[in-house]
Amino acid sequence: MKKILMMMTAVALVAVSCQKTPKITPVPVTVTLAMDGNAYAEEGVNVSLRDLNTSAAYEAKTDETGAATFNVLPGFYEATTQFKKADDGKAYVYNGVNSNITVVQTGENKFSIALAESVTNQIVMKELYNGGCTYKITNADGSDGGTKTFQNDSYVILYNNSDQPADASDICFGFVMPYNSNTTNKYLTDGKLMYDSLGWLPAGNAIWWFNTNVTIPPYSQIVVAIFSAIDHTATYPESVDLSKADYVMYDPEAGFNHAKYSAPSANIPESNYLQTAPYSKGNAWSMSVSSPAFMIFKHDNPNGLSTDSANYDLTSGANAPCVKVPVASVVDAVEVFTEGADDKNKKRFTSAVDAGYIHLSNKLGHTLYRNVDKEATEAIEGNKEKLVYNYAGGTTPNEKSSTDPSGIDAEASIKNGARIIYLDTNNSSKDFHQRKVSSLK
């Protein structure tokens, strides 16, 4: 009888104990995006909520107000998000984390994630070829006729350095005076560029712009022929084939000479001919073949910029006006120095545009090629096994030793299906190296 009473008492105690323990059930939790202390409304952003005790993770997308809703058990959580947006040629990356989320059974479970924004240019110059090549001459009798130089085969490659489509429609091309890095710079006084604090750069001779809408897909490129878009290798084997370029700087109304601007290949539609309106004397676009300060920038009315004398600066002379290009509009730039002339080389870009420079040994078929961002490229999901290492395409010590410090062979990796993210630090000394052979070869 005593045993029966003890059992009944134990059952009763358990019953009482169960009644005192509240039932734990999932509760609604709202996590909203915030920027600078204010709500940030962005629909479709993926938010992750991770249980700090069990590591269980939950995913939800934000609604039109920027709020993501979950149903989880009470406990301690961490909310994170990362997303990207593209606008006006720039890539915006947003990151946010809140590690102090305590979800309770009763009460208002509303939390926020403070976003941090970083901005990079979507569009970068992947490669600039402007120094030309040297070719051998064979005399009629078969004897060696020496060598000559061919330099009417320049091009630039624009690359979408992001995973979002890039609008390049408003991109313009120009160079800052003087033409060469080792010549007298009228803008330089006591070691300082007179326009350093004025918010503009002096673009010489002319600027070029697209004549159609241009969209560059993610991790893709377009080739823009600066001079004749034909197969130069047919005459000069050491040169490049630009007959398959995507776009070409060709505007017959500009009055530029035929030697540099022969009729483009039929592969290139007329809609892909760039336009220009020269504002300085000359029968060709005078971009340097040794050391240009080359830039791409955005402008919604480049023809007006070129033809309105109110935009001109005459420091280089009355016959050589320069257009004042706003520094804020510059998308990318590369300062090229003449090889072997460091006692005379001078910067033309301000440090805000390009804090460094890259040497070019011209006439040898070399190009200036952008270095790979190793960490970012390896971090792309599924990318690492497709990357090709032990890059050996830089120039050798008998010229100016130069290579990509990442060790990644970008072109071989692309052919292997990898996606490449290139360095963009606004410092050509870090961002570029001299490549022995054009990537188009």
Regions found by a protein language model. Give the residues of each.
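Intrinsically disordered, low-complexity linkers and terminal tails enriched in Ser/Thr/Pro/Gly
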Residues: 19-28, 34-42, 52-54, 62-65, ...
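Positively charged n-region of N-terminal signal peptides that target proteins for export
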Residues: 1-4, 19-20
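C-terminal motif of bacterial Sec signal peptides marking the signal peptidase cleavage site
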Residues: 14-17
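Sec-dependent signal peptide hydrophobic core
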Residues: 5-9
